[in-house]
């Protein structure tokens, strides 16, 4: 975790089974089947089995070339990654969540439980009440991670890369009052610390894989910024 409560933080920890590997020219996608202990995991399918998340972790550069040789479908692995919401470059509308992989290791302990955990800390960029029971907040982080240097004959085996992420998450308020909270609590500039899971599903209509960040806990850090949100958009 970050040392200071006002330090940005963006970290994803996954443990699950590889069920598909898709190699492209510049990246490789590893699809993981992960169970988790979040609220969404309580829901069962009609056959009585717990629903599992399918998460697409994308690796670039050296890892994109070497990992397909090291890991195969059916392997249980542990992954460290970061989150980032991407805007469709063609329409400039509709955001989708990417999970950028940093490293992946085999799971030595067969009894190790699946893991799906996100720790995310940053400033609220915008907030919007969908109705009086549900709001969406957009939170920005700027972090630096050490990654392998792929250049040959270098004195520096690792380099620092900056990840700028603006990630959206929804929050439910069964007792109502969400429309007031975007003006009084979840305001732009306010720091929040969030923990949750990555929820991934295959869209039944389009056949495409979609995923989102589901926050289980959202804590305000420091003071709530008093800003008028009437013209804010996500």
Locations of the language-model features?
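Single-stranded nucleic acid-binding surfaces, predominantly the OB-fold ssDNA-binding core
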Residues: 2-234
